[in-house]
UniProtKB/Swiss-Prot annotation:
GO cellular component: mitochondrial inner membrane; mitochondrial small ribosomal subunit; mitochondrion; ribosome
Descriptive protein name: Small ribosomal subunit protein uS12m
Keyword Hydrolase set for record: no
Protein purpose: Component of the mitochondrial ribosome (mitoribosome), a dedicated translation machinery responsible for the synthesis of mitochondrial genome-encoded proteins, including at least some of the essential transmembrane subunits of the mitochondrial respiratory chain. The mitoribosomes are attached to the mitochondrial inner membrane and translation products are cotranslationally integrated into the membrane. uS12m is required for respiratory growth.
CDD domains according to UniProt: Ribosomal_S12 (cd03368)
Gene that encodes it: MRPS12
Family according to the record: Belongs to the universal ribosomal protein uS12 family.
Note: Present with 238 molecules/cell in log phase SD medium.
Range annotated as the organelle transit peptide: 1-20
Chief location bin: mitochondrion
Length: 153
C-alpha cells in the first residue's frame, strides 16, 4: 500500500513534464463552431468614466470651483470644479478653454475624458451647455468649446 502511494506522487510531475513537451495541440474551435457563437466569451469593455453610469453625459450642480496645478513636467493653473451629478456621484471635472463663468450652484453637463496632467480629474465639463457659456472669440475648434460662428460683418 505504501509503495503504491509513493509511485503515484512520483509519477505526477513526470506526467506534467510529458504534457508540456507533447507535440499534439489542444483542440480549437472549427469555423462552423465560431460562426455559431461558441468559444470563449468576449471580455466586457471596462468603462473609462464609471461615475456616469453608461451615459454619454450627465447633468450636475457645481459644488466648488478649483484651480489645480498639473503634474511634474508641466506648469500651469488649470481650472476644474467638483460636480454633484444627478445620480448622486461627486466627480472632479476639468473646465476647458480660456475663461469661464462657472460658480457654485451652476448647472453643468459632464462628459467622460480625463485631463492627462491633473491627477484624479477624469471628466470634462461641456462648454456652451447649461449655465456654462462657450469660449468667447474662439475661431478654431469651436464645437469643442461651445462657441458660435463669428459674424462676417
Amino acid at each position: 500500500m505504501l509503495s503504491r502511494f509513493m509511485s503515484n506522487t512520483w509519477c505526477t510531475p513526470l506526467r506534467q513534464a510529458q504534457r508540456l513537451f507533447s507535440s499534439t495541440t489542444t483542440m480549437q474551435a472549427t469555423l462552423n463552431q465560431i460562426k455559431r457563437g461558441s468559444g470563449p466569451p468576449r471580455r466586457k469593455k471596462i468603462s473609462t468614466a464609471p461615475q456616469l453610469d453608461q451615459c454619454p453625459q450627465r447633468k450636475g450642480v457645481v459644488l466648488r470651483v478649483m484651480v489645480l496645478k498639473p503634474k511634474k513636467p508641466n506648469s500651469a493653473q488649470r481650472k476644474a470644479c467638483r460636480v454633484r451629478l444627478t445620480n448622486g456621484n461627486v466627480v472632479s471635472a476639468y473646465i476647458p478653454g480660456e475663461g469661464h463663468d462657472a460658480q457654485e450652484h451652476s448647472i453643468v453637463y459632464v462628459r467622460g475624458g480625463r485631463c492627462q496632467d491633473l491627477p484624479g480629474v477624469k471628466y470634462h465639463v461641456i462648454r456652451g451647455a447649461g449655465d456654462l457659456s462657450g469660449v468667447v472669440n474662439r475661431i478654431s475648434s469651436r464645437s469643442k468649446y461651445g462657441a458660435k460662428k463669428p459674424s462676417k460683418s
